[in-house]
């Protein structure tokens, strides 16, 4: 059936035909035409794929509490991992036929990783990104967002940018690595 999951902590909504959720580990797997909406101020980001998966970032990196012994004073300091309830302690992955839509840009790729910690979309397997009159391609594309808006892009291996200037005039840039910035 149709399932809707709203996470008010990180401002996301998942709509899918089928959802498997583990409330203990806070992992969610969505299939059958899943759609994730990342709520932003004026321009939300919509991500669709064959499969969406989301979980705690600290589980991915196995963040643990640590114990440190102070050899000078002979005391023990315990550092507790408080990321378990942090709203930025989330990531999501999208697999197969990934599509990203927003008012300012669109993208397609085969698979994607997004971390709420650094607000970076990592696009893999033949990614293509469109913004206004520009198209960017490469083997891997990192899309960095700042204040919930597209800020800059890093393109790795086989970078290519096409930018339309006039109806019959285009800029074309090809390189092994590219850094591009968005401006209003």
Where would I find each of the regions flagged by the language model?
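Structural signature for solvent-exposed beta-strand/loop edge elements and short helix-capping sites
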Residues: 1-184
């Amino acid at each position: 059936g149709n399932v809707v999951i709203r996470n008010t902590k990180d401002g996301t909504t998942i709509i899918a035909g089928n959802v498997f959720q583990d409330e203990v580990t806070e992992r969610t797997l969505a299939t059958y035409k899943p759609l994730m909406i990342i709520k932003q101020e004026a321009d939300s980001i919509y991500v669709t794929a064959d499969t969406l998966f989301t979980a705690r970032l600290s589980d991915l990196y196995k963040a643990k509490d640590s114990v440190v012994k102070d050899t000078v004073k002979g005391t023990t300091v315990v550092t507790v991992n408080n990321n378990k309830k942090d709203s930025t302690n989330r990531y999501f992955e999208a697999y197969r036929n990934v599509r990203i839509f927003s008012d300012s840009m669109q993208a397609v790729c085969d698979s994607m990783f997004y971390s709420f910690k650094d607000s970076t979309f990592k696009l893999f397997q033949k990614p293509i990104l469109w913004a206004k009159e520009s198209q960017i391609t490469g083997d891997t594309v990192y899309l960095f967002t700042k204040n919930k808006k597209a800020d800059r892009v890093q393109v790795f291996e086989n970078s290519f940018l096409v930018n339309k200037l006039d109806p019959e005039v285009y800029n074309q840039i090809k390189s092994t690595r590219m850094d591009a910035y968005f401006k209003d």
